[in-house]
Amino acid sequence: MAWALLLLTLLTQGTGSWAQSALTQPPFVSGAPGQSVTISCTGTSSDVGDYDHVFWYQKRLSTTSRLLIYNVNTRPSGISDLFSGSKSGNMASLTISGLKSEVEANYHCSLYSSSYTF
């Protein structure tokens, strides 16, 4: 039986002390098991383009947000190498390789760490 794994993304607006920017993500992306998908996060030259402080979070039902990537492409200890981050110009991306059912979740980008207010 063929099935598609749905990965939901959120629109995120950061509001903090050093930037007030609207970051744009697609409403959803999907892929089949084993495939790779990339979620984009588009900003401007004065936010994503200027800074390497892009963070990616995963939010599953009934759990708190989990930091997947910080400073564009760095994974915290314990985060699977299925997740990778990159940036080109005003767009940051999160790539999830080898899709599995356990990565079905909400994903969002931010210019802030979880210690800031979103």
UniProtKB/Swiss-Prot annotation:
Region ranges (Framework-1): 20-44
Biological process, per Gene Ontology: adaptive immune response; immune response
Region (Complementarity-determining-3) residue spans: 110-118
Subcellular location: Secreted; Cell membrane
Main location per the UniProt record: secreted
UniProt protein name: Probable non-functional immunoglobulin lambda variable 2-33
Any one Pfam family match given in the protein's UniProt record, by short name: V-set
Keyword entries, A-Z: Adaptive immunity, Cell membrane, Disulfide bond, Immunity, Immunoglobulin, Immunoglobulin domain, Membrane, Secreted, Signal
Signal peptide start-end: 1-19
Entry annotated with the keyword Disulfide bond: yes
Region annotation Complementarity-determining-2: where it falls in the sequence: 71-73
Positions of the UniProt region annotated as Complementarity-determining-1: 45-53
Keyword Lipid biosynthesis (UniProt): no
Biological source species: Homo sapiens (Human)
Functional summary from the UniProt entry: Probable non-functional open reading frame (ORF) of V region of the variable domain of immunoglobulin light chains. Non-functional ORF generally cannot participate in the synthesis of a productive immunoglobulin chain due to altered V-(D)-J or switch recombination and/or splicing site (at mRNA level) and/or conserved amino acid change (protein level). Immunoglobulins, also known as antibodies, are membrane-bound or secreted glycoproteins produced by B lymphocytes.
Stretches for region Framework-3: 74-109
Region (Framework-2): 54-70
Subunit record text: Immunoglobulins are composed of two identical heavy chains and two identical light chains; disulfide-linked.
Gene name per UniProt: IGLV2-33
Cystine bridges: C41-C109
Annotated PROSITE patterns: IG_LIKE
